[in-house]
Design a protein with these regions (language model features):
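Positively charged n-region of N-terminal signal peptides that target proteins for export
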Residues: 1-5
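Bacterial N-terminal signal peptides
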Residues: 7-18
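Sec/Tat signal peptide C-region and signal peptidase I cleavage site
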Residues: 18-25
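Short, glycine-/small- and polar/acidic-enriched structural segments
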Residues: 26-156, 163-165, 172-178, 191-192, ...
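Pocket-lining segment of extracytoplasmic ligand-binding domains
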Residues: 84-85, 158-252
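Small-molecule pocket liners
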Residues: 102-108, 203-207, 211-212, 287
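Secondary-structure end/capping motifs
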Residues: 217-300
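Conserved C-terminal helix/tail region of periplasmic/extracytoplasmic solute-binding proteins
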Residues: 288-324
């Protein structure tokens, strides 16, 4: 196992011990769409802040994004963070998006010795984060634009884990987030290259919840969304707030110094490049165009109603209270 993978497991163990506990009937079950890592540390902190304001939560991390979405759809969880568009139309209002947390600032990566253009990938295997994820949406769009068809589709959750697979020669084409793309290129830029991707990125990770839970817990929903909007605003001004909050709350106490030192750099890069960016109604409209082209939504943009997919009142309240 690589050092990066070992540290990822340590992160997961540290957050799991802090964020989980006995669940009561009033506890909001939260399903995270990927294993806990540095990338989700800000989300963990926002949940902790909401808990301090009386929102009882228990967070569970799933190995695959589609499992987290299904947990919310089925009622095993009430709240989720993932990309739920692929199943939202079929679920007919079971869940509603609350706030966009991250954007699809991702890059297609290929092994230079094997592929040089998108055309070279016609009929070839390609690895994504998970079924129905933003990475697969990007792949679908680029395949459509390039008039190619992928061969076998493989799925490895987490950009850091896909880096390990690339370095070990297990995969030769995938899509990585911005920070991990930079890490890969620093380590092995002579072996790998980026291909053209999509511009004007849509929402990636979205905070969403069951509609029936929203209706019964509107005060809690307001607090939850407000804490995410507030923290993202603080992060935009000072990315080091994530490390400050980690220390303040005693999260990840056993985290190696090497990783702690990289946390602020990770969020600094993410904020600078627009990865961590909240959104509501403005995000919804661009999301429709993107996920329609990706095949994860059906119909025409003009036919899709924002209110069928989003409950915007908490986000609008938070922005009015805190400022954009």
């Amino acid at each position: 196992m690589s050092r990066l993978s070992i540290y990822a497991l340590m992160l997961a163990a540290g957050l799991g011990a802090t964020l989980t506990g006995p669940a009561s009937a009033q506890t909001g079950q939260v399903a995270l769409g990927e294993p806990v890592s540095v990338e989700t540390l800000a989300m963990a902190i926002a949940f902790e802040r909401a808990k301090e304001r009386g929102v009882d939560l228990k967070v569970t991390s799933f190995s695959k994004e589609e499992l987290a979405v299904q947990a919310v759809i089925s009622g095993q969880a009430q709240i989720g963070i993932a990309t739920p568009y692929a199943v939202m139309q079929k679920s007919k209002g079971t869940v509603k998006n609350l706030v966009t947390l991250t954007k699809l600032v991702f890059f297609p990566i290929v092994e230079k010795a094997t592929y040089k253009t998108w055309k070279d990938l016609d009929g070839q295997p390609f690895t994504f984060h998970s079924r129905g994820s933003g990475t697969e949406a990007i792949g679908n769009i680029m395949a459509k634009r390039q008039n190619i068809t992928f061969g076998q589709r493989n799925y490895i959750s987490g950009s850091d884990n896909r880096i390990v697979a690339l370095m070990n020669g297990q995969i030769k084409a995938t899509i990585l987030d911005l920070p991990n793309t930079k890490i890969l290129m620093e380590k092995a830029g002579d072996r790998f290259a980026t291909l053209p991707g999509v511009e004007n990125p849509a929402s990636d990770e979205i905070l969403f919840a069951r509609t029936d839970w929203i209706d019964k817990n509107k005060d809690k929903v307001d607090i939850l969304v407000e804490e995410f909007v507030k923290l993202w605003g603080e992060m935009a001004k000072n990315p080091a707030i994530i490390e400050t909050e980690r220390v303040k709350r005693g999260l990840l106490k056993d985290l190696p110094k090497e990783i702690v030192e990289k946390t602020t750099a990770f969020y600094t890069t993410g904020v600078k490049e627009g990865l961590y960016k909240v959104g509501g109604g403005d995000a919804a409209k661009s999301d429709f165009e993107f996920y329609l082209e990706a095949g994860q939504l059906t119909g025409a943009p003009a036919e899709l109603k924002v209110e069928d997919f989003w409950y915007l009142a908490p986000y609008d309240k938070a922005v009015k209270k805190l400022g954009s």
